[in-house]
Amino acid sequence: MVKIVECQQQHFRALSYSLSPEQAKFTALPSVWFADLNAKKPWKAFSILFDDEPVGFFVLDQGEDRQKYSDNPQAVLLRSMSIHPDFQGLGIAKQALSHQRLMPLLLHHFPSSHEIVLGVNHLNQRAYAFYLACGFKHTQRELMGIRGKQSILSLDFSICKHS
C-alpha cells in the first residue's frame, strides 16, 4: 500500500539513494533537502511509503519560485519527485500522485491551494509522459531552467474541492 507522509528524520537513511545519471540530471536527490527539513520554510517535504517503508520523496513548495510556473497565487510547486531505483516500475509514483492521495494532502497542508504545478525538462520525455498519465495538463507555458527548457504542467483540484 502507498501512503504519503511528512518526511521525518528516521526516513533519511532509506531515502539516501542514488539515481541513474540519466535521472539524476533532472531532479535533486532527497538528501539535498534534509538539512533544511525542520527549518521554517515555505515548503514541505514528503516521503512516499510503500508497505510502510520510505521509497520515494517530493517537495511541495509555496515559495516565490512557484510564481514562475503559475499566475495562480494559491498554486504549489511540486519539486524533486523521485522513487528509489529498486522500487521504480511498480506504479508507486503514479499511486502517490493520484487524486486519492494528493487531495487529502493539499486539504491538510495547503488548504487554500487547488493547483499543483511543476516543470519537466524537454529532454525528459519519460517524466513528461508519466505526469500526463497522472492527470497533469500541459499549460503551454515554458520556462528556461538550469538544465534547459521546461514544459510547465498543472494539476487542478478546484473542481474536486468544490464538489
Where do the model's predicted regions map?
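Acetyl-CoA-dependent GNAT
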Residues: V2, E6-S80, H84-D86, L97-H99, ...
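Active-site acidic-Proline motif in GNAT/NAT acetyltransferases
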Residues: H84-D86, L90, H122-L123
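Conserved active-site alpha-helix within GNAT-family acetyltransferase domains
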Residues: K94, P104, H122-Q140
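Conserved beta-strand-loop-alpha-helix junction that forms the acyl-donor binding cleft
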Residues: S112-Y128, M144-K149
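Terminal substrate-recognition subdomain of acyl/acetyltransferases
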Residues: E142-S163
